[in-house]
Amino acid sequence: MKDGKENSNATFGSFTTNLDHTKPCWYWDKKDLAHTPSQSDLDPATEARYRREGARFIFDVGTRLGLHYDTLATGITYFHRFYMFHSFKQFPRYVTGACCLFLAGKVEETPKKCKDIIKTARSLLNDVQFAQFGDDPKEEVMVLERILLQTIKFDLQVEHPYQFLLRYAKQLKGDKNKVQKLVQMAWTFVNDSLCTMLSLQWEPEIIAVAVMYLAGRLCKFDIQEWTSKQSSRRWWEQFVQDVPVELLEDICHQILDLYSQGKQPIPQQPPMQDKEKPPPPPAAPPGQSGAQNPPAQPPSKKNSPQASPPAKIKRQHVSPKDEPKAPAEQVGSKIPRLESPMPPLPVSQPPERKTPSAIPAPPAEAEPAAASELDPAQGPAPPLPHGAPPPLPHRPPPTEFGGPCSDFLSSVKHKRRYLDDDRNL
């Protein structure tokens, strides 16, 4: 034991001199965990986040590769032990995580090729994160493996709370369904505890008892009967000795704090408020002085004129007098305007003859020319139904194209004569 202490002092410098060497090799107090080389040039919150991200990275990569839970827990334990002596600035967390998983696979007899681990890591990380592996990722992992082995002093065998949890659960009595539910929840807490530094503070037996205590409180399962040591005051005293309730509650709080830290960076209310603000801007660009006056009714009808903005501008000039009746008239007046965009349409629409009467100049020029050409062919034309397009062109044909147009008009005359004869019959 003394030789191991001397080697650690010679290898890792003054940091190990500040640790309590009376404890086992891989367990420290909280005061020692607050001053580690991993926190150099980092605040405690960032250092804790790096540890969580590295542990989750190992868990995700190992899960995709189909590795056993013992292999994942061993790799995460190597990860935490490595950063008790090194800095995150000097050794990137994702490269270290891949190296720890690679070594843990060989130790737990579930080896995976380094290229497979790197390939899986590439699928999980973005370009910035994967840039930590450098130009030759495999060489980075292989070189770091030697540093990892020297850091953990070739102490490769690691025990985990899983086996103790299953062993202790068999000693409990009661409803089997409740006991099974308790074990399942406690198993989940063990997985989550790997993202914390509990494996650097307490033995796996104590962590197993703590997660059972927490699961029993949450499941409302009071553990009162057990198979051995009925003389014990508390149920966990048959498994571990001299463990007060305060210690178990402290471990439980460290696990629960992990969930609270994960919920803080997920605010969902601000994005919902931002989504409610975009609807007003689309109405602002086409909105004019007259469009802002009726705020209650236009919202449902502002979306329809967006497809035809010129028609909306014309509608504003046609009916500026009666604003309350504008929404009812817009629906009927837009249909013929979309079908025939020619200017002299008000002549063939009886309901809109009142509006062009106020402006006699434009229709006066188009009416005599159209009447001179249509009177000999049609005579007095009956009023067309509202919304139906006129059968003939609105403007008179030019003189230079008189030949073809005259033939067309003569054919129309003959067709109408035949129709009149059929009606008389």
Curated annotation (Swiss-Prot):
The keyword Cell cycle applies. GO terms for cellular component: cyclin/CDK positive transcription elongation factor complex; nucleus. It is found in: Nucleus. Residues 366-377 have a biased composition (Low complexity). SMART domains: CYCLIN (SM00385), Cyclin_C (SM01332). Disruption phenotype: Morpholino knockdown of the protein causes unconsumed yolk sac, small eyes, deformed head, reduced lower jaw size and curly spinal cord at low morpholino doses. High morpholino doses lead to embryonic lethality. CDD domains: CYCLIN_CCNK_rpt1, CYCLIN_CCNK_rpt2. One of its GO terms (molecular function) is cyclin-dependent protein serine/threonine kinase activator activity. Gene3D superfamilies: Cyclin-like. It comes from the Eukaryota. Residues 262-425 are annotated as: Disordered. GO terms for biological process: cell division; central nervous system development; positive regulation of DNA-templated transcription, elongation; positive regulation of transcription by RNA polymerase II. Regulatory subunit of cyclin-dependent kinases that mediates activation of target kinases. Plays a role in transcriptional regulation via its role in regulating the phosphorylation of the C-terminal domain (CTD) of the large subunit of RNA polymerase II (POLR2A). Belongs to the cyclin family. This is Cyclin-K. It comes from Danio rerio (Zebrafish).
